[in-house]
Amino acid sequence: MIQIQSYLDVADNSGARKLMCIRVLGTGNRKYADIGDIIIAVVKEAVPNMFLKRSEVVRAVVVRTRRGLKRRNGMVLEFDDNAAVIINQEGNPRGTRIFGPVARELRECNFARVVSLAPEVL
């Protein structure tokens, strides 16, 4: 579960290293984001000489959470970290590579481009 003020790792090569969630997008006043949800975040740590700088406000999709994701067959999927991929307004990733595994549920959330770039889909 990602809420406001939560820190996330960045799972792509867009230039950011750490994000802080400042808003969870969706209907109503949502408090938490799960895998596949879009958040508004601020870049807290960035790689020098890249196109994303510190204190930039970006949109990101959550790809990994430490809280378990329960599937219909009863399996619970837990990751070691909270991570997100930075996306543009159309929902395409801004980076060209994605690091680490992502959940299969992203394909159902219309993030097929993110799933296709991922090295491992669980």
Swiss-Prot record:
Any Gene Ontology biological process: translation
InterPro entries the record matches: Ribosomal_uL14, Ribosomal_uL14_bac-type, Ribosomal_uL14_CS, Ribosomal_uL14_sf
Gene3D superfamilies tied to this protein: Ribosomal protein L14
Keyword Ribosomal protein belongs to the record: yes
Database matches in CDD domains: Ribosomal_uL14
Keyword Membrane: no
One Pfam short name: Ribosomal_L14
Gene Ontology CC, one term: chloroplast
Keywords from the UniProt entry: Chloroplast, Plastid, Ribonucleoprotein, Ribosomal protein, RNA-binding, rRNA-binding
Compartments, record wording: Plastid, Chloroplast
SUPFAM superfamilies xref list: Ribosomal protein L14 (SSF50193)
GO terms of molecular function: large ribosomal subunit rRNA binding; structural constituent of ribosome
Similarity comment: family membership: Belongs to the universal ribosomal protein uL14 family.
Function statement: Binds to 23S rRNA.
PANTHER family attached to this UniProt entry: 50S/60S RIBOSOMAL PROTEIN L14/L23 (PTHR11761), LARGE RIBOSOMAL SUBUNIT PROTEIN UL14M (PTHR11761:SF3)
Subunit structure: Part of the 50S ribosomal subunit.
Name of the featured protein: Large ribosomal subunit protein uL14c
Organism: Adiantum capillus-veneris
Gene name of this polypeptide: rpl14
